[in-house]
Amino acid sequence: MMGEFHTQFQQIKQNNINNNNNNNNNNSNNNNNFDPITSLTNNNNNKIISPLNSNRQQPNSNTNNNSNNKNNNKSNLLDIILDNNNLENNIDNNNNNNNNNNNNNNNNNNNNSKSIINLIDNNNNNNKNNNNNNNNNNILKIPIDYTPVDKNTESIFKGFSPFSFKQQQPIDTSDQQQKETKKLQLNINSNNKNNNNIINNSNNNNNINNIESNNNNLNSASTSPIPTPTSLTAVSVPSSSPLPSPTSPNTILQSPTTTTTTTTTTSNSSVSPQPTQINKTDKYLLPMSAPRSCEFCGSSQTPTWRRGPSGKGSLCNACGIKWRLKGKDGIFKPSQKQQNRQKPIMSAQKQPKQQQNQPQQQQPQQPQQPQQPQQQNQQQNQQQSIQSQPQQRQNNHLILNQQTINQHLQMLSKQHQQQASQSMFQQQQLHNNQHSNDSNYNSYNNNNNNNNNNYSQHEQLPPISSYNSMNNNNNSNNSNNNNNNNNYSQIPQYGSDDNVSVPNQSPDSYKPSKKRKPEFIHTDTSGNPIEFEKGYYCKYCKKTWPQSSFRNSQQFGAHCSNCSRKPKGELEELISIKKKLSKKKSKEGNYYQEEDGAVPYWDMNRYNNNNNNNNGINNNNNNNNNNNNNNSNNNGSYNNNNSNNNNNNNRIEPIVNNNINNFNSINNNNSNNNNNNNSTSQNAPLLQRLIHVVENQLLEPNELSSIREDIDIMKNDLILRKKKRIAQLNDLKQKANNDVQILKANIEKGSNQRSNESKSFITDLKQEIDKRLNQYTHIYIPPDHHLVPSSTNYLSIDSLQNSSSSNNYGTIHNSNNNNNNNNNNNKRSLVNLSPELIHSPLKKPMVGGYRDEQGMKHFSIDGDNLSLPSIS
C-alpha cells in the first residue's frame, strides 16, 4: 500500500514537470506570434478568430493537454517506480531547462508588452513562471513519512490526504526500493482514475503550489519569491464557467460574463476531498473587484470615477465632466476614435452564432496530430482568448451604449410620427368640413402625381419646412383644379396645440434627471434626429424656456434664483392681471395670447387665437381677379400677385388664423423664380429658419404696443391705489385730531370743576371757623374790655363787625346800641385796644409830639393841641 502511494506521488511530480514544459512553450510561442492590439490572426493556421470564440476555445486546449499528460503517465509509470535515481536526475535537468525558459519568457514579455491590453497578461505570465519554479523546487523538498500505517487508513490514502509536511529529512532510497519490490502491486485502473482526478485542468499546478508554499519555507537563493496576497493580480475570466468536474474532464465553458477570479485560486473538487487543507489558503486571498473601464473612452486609469448613465462610477473623470456639462440630458455622441474602434467589433458581432460555433465543432473531428504542434496551436488560442477578454469587455460596453441610444431614438421617432399623424388627421377633417363649398384651393408648385411620397416626406418635417415646400403658381391654377382636393388632403397642417413637432416632454423610458430640462428633438424625412435641442423648465414661473434664451445652465440657474425670490402673491397678481389684459382686443382686430417674448421659434400657436374673419390682403392685377376671389376664404396666406414688378409692389403682412391654425402656401407669381426658391430652400435649412424668424419678427410691433398698453393700465391702477391710500390716511388723521380735542376739553372741564369744588370747600370751612370764633369771643371776652373811642365817626357797628370777622379781630360793640339807636352817627364808636398798648408800660405823653419806637420825635397834627417846639 505504501508503494502504491509512492508511485502516485511520483506520478504527480512527473505530471507537474510536463505541464510546466507545456506552459513555458506556450508562453514563448504566444509572445512571438500574438499581436496584442488586433488579437485576430494566428500565424500557424492563418485563420481569423473572433474575440467571441476565444473563450470557448480555451477549454479544448486544456483537455488536449490533459489527454497528452495521461498518455505520458501510462507509459512512464513503471519507469518512475523502478528508477528513482534516474528520476531525480531528470528532475534536476528539467529544473535547469525551466529556469532558462522562464528567463527567456520574461525577456520576451518585456520586449512585446507595449500595449495597454497586454500589461495584465504579462504579469499573469510572470506569476505562472514563478509558480512553476516554486513547484519544481517544492517537489524535491517534500519529505514523506514511511512509518507503518494501520489498515483502517487505506481509504484515506486513496484521496491523497495524509501528506505530512515536516522539516526536510534525507530519504533512504535503498530501503525504499526494497519495500517497493516486496509490497508493490500495480493497479492500472486505480491509477487511471487517480490521474483523471488529478489532471483535469492546468490550474491544478497553481493549487498545489499554494498549498506547498504556505507550509514550507523556500530558500531565496534557489527560488524566486512567492507573490504575497497583496500582490496578486486579477484577471477577468468568466464567472459562469465552472471548473471541470472529475467525472467529465472535457467540459466546455458556457456563456461568458465579466467577473473576476485570481490566478492563485484553488479548486477543492480537483485536489482532495478534504476541504480543510485548501480552505486555509482562502484566508490569505483578498476579494478582487473587476477592472473598471470607462463606458465612453474605455480607459481604466483615472484619478476619480464619476457617475455615468449606467450607474455609479462608470465614467472616468474627463468623460464624466463632459457628460455632466453637455450630454447628460441629451444623447451621448461617441467621438470619431470610438466609432473607428467599434467598426471591426460590429462586423464580428454580426456573424451568426452558427458560424461562431463552427471552429469549435470541427476540432474534435480532426485527426490527432503530433503532440507538440497540436499543443502549441491550442495554447496559442488559449493565450489569445485570455488577452482579448479585457478589450472585448471594453468594446461590449460601447456596443451596448450605442444600442440603447439607437433604441431610444427609434422609440422617440415612432412616438413623434404617431403624434404627427393624429394631429394631421384631425386638421384634415376640420379643413374638409369648413372648405367643402369651395372649389379652388392653393396647390403645390411642382405638378407631380406622387402624392403618397409627398405625404410621407412632409409628415415628419418640422413646421418651418412647410413654408417653403408649399408654393403656388397662379398661372397654373386652371390646370390643377382637378387635383386640389387630393393634394390638399396630403398637405401637413401645422400650428395647433396638438401638432407641435417638438414634444414638451420626453417619453417615460428616457426622462431626464431634472424636471426643469425637457428635451426637444427634430427629425428629418428619414426619421433620424437632426438636432438635439434642450429646454429649461422653471418650476417657479412654470414655463419651459428654449435653450436659445440662455447662454448656459448657469444663467438659467440665476433666472430660477430670481424667480424664487419673488413672493408668490405678487407673481399670482401679475399673472391674473396679464390674463385679464390678454383678453382685450388689439388695434388690428387680432387677439393675442399673453406671452413674455421668450417663445420657441417653432411654436407659432401661442399667437393664434380667436380670429374668425381675417382675410388675406391681395394685391391683384387684372389677369388674376377670378382666382383671387375664390381664394378669399383662405386665411393667413401670403399673396404676392404681381406680374410686372416683384420687388416694388410686394406687400407681406401676416394674418393669423386661430380656427384652422395653419399657414397656407406662399403664392409667388413669377414662375422662373419658383424652381430656384424650392432648390435653395431644400438645400439650405438655415435659410428656412432665418425666413421663419423674420416672419415672427413682423409680429413684434403689435406685441410691443400691447405690452405698452398693459404697462399704462398697470400704472394707472397703481396711481388710483395710491390716491385711495392717501385719502384713507387723511381721514384717519382728521379723526385722530377730533378725538384729541374732545379729550383735551374733557380734561380741562374736569380740572376746573375740581378746582371750584376745592375753593368752595375752603370758603365754607373758613366761614364755619369764623362763626365758632365769634361765639367764643362773646363768651370769654367782655364787651367793654379794652375799648377806646375812635377818633373818627365813619365806621358803623355792622361794618365793624364784618371787618372784625374777616380780619380775625375782636368784635366791636357799641355801648349805646340799646339806648341810642338814632344817634349812632353822631357819637364816636368804641374800638378795641391793641394788645401792644394793653401790655406796654404807661408813658408820659410828650408835649407837642411823641417818639416812635426808634426814638424819633414826631409832632402831633391835632388841631386842638397845636403847639410848636421851642427853638433853642
UniProtKB/Swiss-Prot annotation:
GO terms for cellular component: nucleus. GO terms for biological process: regulation of cell differentiation; regulation of DNA-templated transcription; regulation of transcription by RNA polymerase II. Residues 15-75, 89-137, 188-279, 333-393, 410-526, 602-656, 663-682, 806-829 are annotated as: Disordered. Keywords: Metal-binding, Nucleus, Transcription, Transcription regulation, Zinc, Zinc-finger. PROSITE patterns: GATA_ZN_FINGER_2. Residues 188-240, 254-277, 349-393, 410-458, 465-489, 608-656, 806-826 have a biased composition (Low complexity). Disruption phenotype: Cells destined to become spores end up as stalk cells. InterPro entries: Znf_GATA, Znf_NHR/GATA. Pfam families: GATA (PF00320). A zinc finger (GATA-type) spans 294-319. GO terms for molecular function: DNA-binding transcription factor activity; transcription cis-regulatory region binding; zinc ion binding. It is found in: Nucleus. Gene3D superfamilies: Erythroid Transcription Factor GATA-1, subunit A. Residues 490-508 have a biased composition (Polar residues). Probable transcription factor. Seems to act on the expression of the genes culC, culD, rnpA and sigB. This is Transcription factor stalky. It comes from Dictyostelium discoideum.
